[in-house]
Amino acid sequence: MHVDHTDSQKALRRELRAYFSSLMTPEIREATRGNEGGATYKQVIRQLGKDGWLALGWPKEYGGQGRPSTEQLVFFEEAQLAEVPLPFVTISTVAPCLIALGSDEHKRFFLPKIAAGELHFAIGYTEPGAGTDLASLKTSAVRDGNDYVINGNKIWTSSAEAADYVWLAARTDQDVKPPHKGISIFMVDAKTPGFSFTPIRTVGGVRSNASYYDNVRVPASMIAGELNGGWKLITSQLNHERVGLAAIGVQGWGLLARTLKWAQDTVVGGKRVVEQPWAQSALAEVYTRLEAMRLMNWRMAWQLDSGEPDPAFASAMKAYSTECLIAVDKLMLEVTGMAGGYRRGSPGAALAGDLEEHYRKCQINTFGGGVAEVMRDLVAQFGLGMTGYSRR
């Protein structure tokens, strides 16, 4: 494992930094803040697609640049630092599943549109009674001629308001044991009659949705992979999602740089905050945690280039990185004091309120893609060889 950037990675980082600097004007940044929909968001995504960035790590035969995962990580890091909105679920989780396990027909239809920034997915997994124990999901899909009729409801269907399709897990065999063997993945057109959603507002201001399926008819040809083979797709998709969620840790570096600048410029009790031993200790711990996360991210990217991500390490990385962001935000809020807790638009808000906003937003990442408790179970089972158990 090479822990320093190669010349190619350094060149890519410089290119991306310059590109994002011109793409993300202050007006576009404000219009797309926390918004995974709307005209400006779609305009930015299409521009990214037109310029060839959305399929950076895909094989060339599917319209990608064929770059390794390490260079794709460079892309995500620079995008996070520049606050570029990305259709993360679509390009980083659904598309890799289609490339690895999708039919030729699905690849031909979906991948070019995803690469162009013209088609977006939402994920339909979690239900009110099936989150951590996803295999117990109740949403049903019953064969009727050439279609399946889907009934049920989902929760935490993020980006449903902007999605063209939903990557939906539904039960196609009610009797099989164990129950995860009776699940299939459907690609549901969001314009299909009977599909609807209502918004859920989270503490961080990020929108999610509850979604509903009332006799939604989906062609049998829109099953991804094999009938009753959805669990393999789910686990593959979640491993990619966990890797991607881990990569958001680079957000902490931008906040650290701004917090350090604030501490250098702010005087309390006749001394700059940065000269206070307690502030130095807190900022040093932030740096240490973020640097550890960065190295783990690069190991994960290296694993992806070597094959499928190790489920134990992917789970460990996801748990560590999402909890690490909360921890470092708390430390930086201690350094900034009361001013750090003021919201955006408030007079005297440190970092223009961005630190406070990020602290609220990053909470959701601890359970998106699998709650931290389950991540630890997976580490114990696949990494330490311990016996798995049912939470029922």
Question: Where do the model's predicted regions map?
Answer:
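Glycine-rich phosphate/cofactor-binding loops in nucleotide/flavin-utilizing enzymes
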Residues: 2, 70, 74-75, 93, ...
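Glycine-rich beta->alpha junctions and the first turn(s) of the following alpha-helix
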Residues: 3-5, 195-292, 365, 381
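A short core secondary-structure module
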Residues: 146-147, 151-196
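A structural signal for short hydrophobic beta-strand segments in well-ordered beta-sheet cores
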Residues: 139-142
